Amino acid sequence: MKLEYNRIIDSTLVKADTLPHEIDTLCADAHKYQFFAVCVNPSYVSYAKNILKNTAVQLCCVVGFPLGQTTQKQKVYEAKIAIKEGADEIDMVMNIAEFKKRCACVITEIRAVKKVCGKRKLKVIIETALLTNDEIKDAVNVCIDGNADYVKTSTGFSFRGASLEDVQIMNNAAANLIKIKASGGIKTAKQFIDLFQAGASRIGTSNAVQIMQELKKMNHEYH
């Protein structure tokens, strides 16, 4: 049986000028293609939840986004509100500056947000574009120590998004102790398949429909 690629997609819309009708389309497409989740900014959680309430599509919300430069208390509060308004998953940005200082507070912060999430999945964005290869490995281990469910490549707001090398490094460091989400600049079916084969078990993209249409032409199975 072929993999159902649609079931590893987080269809994403987190740009600053997002309008309600764009969220309508995001959610309608997610239901049509049966994507695993949609990912939105905090201001659209309750709006998107109302649209998705009779579907199987999960709702993901970003926290500390896109810079990660909010405090632990702020990230915890933001996650609490998002969950209260209907978020099923949280994608949180790691404090990259504190990580580079090797501060143990980064692990404490991840654990604090995971405690709020409970059984809901927590994905931690490490912004690989700003890290060396060794720092990427260390960041994966920090996320493992923080009890995160996923380590995620990128916000999509830095100078580049996910690369194949990033995911390969993350996959080797993860050692099956944490899952990997690739995101940022994923626009083609080839990128999608390459990143999946490199070890990403969830892929975030703002080009989900186009990718599914390309996959169909390539005769990959999907719903």
Curated annotation (Swiss-Prot):
Q: What is its EC number?
A: 4.1.2.4
Pathway(s) this gene product operates in, as recorded in its UniProt entry:
Carbohydrate degradation; 2-deoxy-D-ribose 1-phosphate degradation; D-glyceraldehyde 3-phosphate and acetaldehyde from 2-deoxy-alpha-D-ribose 1-phosphate: step 2/2
Q: Which reaction does it catalyse?
A: 2-deoxy-D-ribose 5-phosphate = D-glyceraldehyde 3-phosphate + acetaldehyde
User: What Gene Ontology molecular-function terms does this entry list?
Assistant: deoxyribose-phosphate aldolase activity
* Presence of keyword Lyase: yes
Keyword annotations from UniProtKB, A to Z: Cytoplasm, Lyase, Schiff base
The record, for Gene3D superfamilies, names: Aldolase class I (3.20.20.70)
One Pfam family assigned to this protein is DeoC
Superkingdom of the source species: Bacteria
Q: Can the keyword Cytoplasm be found in this entry's annotation?
A: yes
Q: Might you report a single GO cellular component term?
A: cytoplasm
> Catalytic center at which residues?
D91, K152, K181
Q: Which InterPro entries match?
A: Aldolase_TIM, DeoC, DeoC/FbaB/LacD_aldolase, DeoC_typeI
Subcellular location(s): the record lists: Cytoplasm
Example of a GO biological process term: carbohydrate catabolic process
- Signal peptide as annotated in the record: none
What this chain does, per the entry, is described as: Catalyzes a reversible aldol reaction between acetaldehyde and D-glyceraldehyde 3-phosphate to generate 2-deoxy-D-ribose 5-phosphate.
**Annotated family:** Belongs to the DeoC/FbaB aldolase family. DeoC type 1 subfamily.
Under what name is this protein listed?
Answer: Deoxyribose-phosphate aldolase
Q: Which organism is it from?
A: Mycoplasma genitalium (strain ATCC 33530 / DSM 19775 / NCTC 10195 / G37)
